[in-house]
Amino acid sequence: MSLSFELRCVGRCLVLAVALLPQPGNAADASNGSRIAHRWCAACHVVTPAQLRPTTDLAPPFATIAKRPGFDAAKIALFLLDPHPKMPDMSLTRAEAADLAAYIGSLARK
């Protein structure tokens, strides 16, 4: 492979990654993110301060995720589009992933 081919591949990957990020001007809806969290995430994560505990202790509470140094809602949203193997494939849209990430981020203030 030539260097120019490799650079084109890297460039295409970067363009794709940027395209998957939430778009500016389309404000994420944390209240919709809350609904998504209760539907998809509450079985494994504590998704609200009022929730006593999930069915497993393997997944961190959303508030803990939100309070981590360097928390970045855009990175969380991108991760949610292709989660790790232990998480179910929720087939979220970019907007839904951004909403869920906004909701998680809102828990840092609680």
Name the predicted role of every residue range.
Residues G11-C13, A27, V46-T48, F71-L78:
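Residue-level detector of functional hotspots within protein domains
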Residues L7-C9, L20, S34, T55, ...:
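Generic structural signal for beta-strand residues in well-ordered domains
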Residues A28-L58, P83-P85, S106-K110:
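Periplasmic/extracellular electron-transfer cofactor-ligation site
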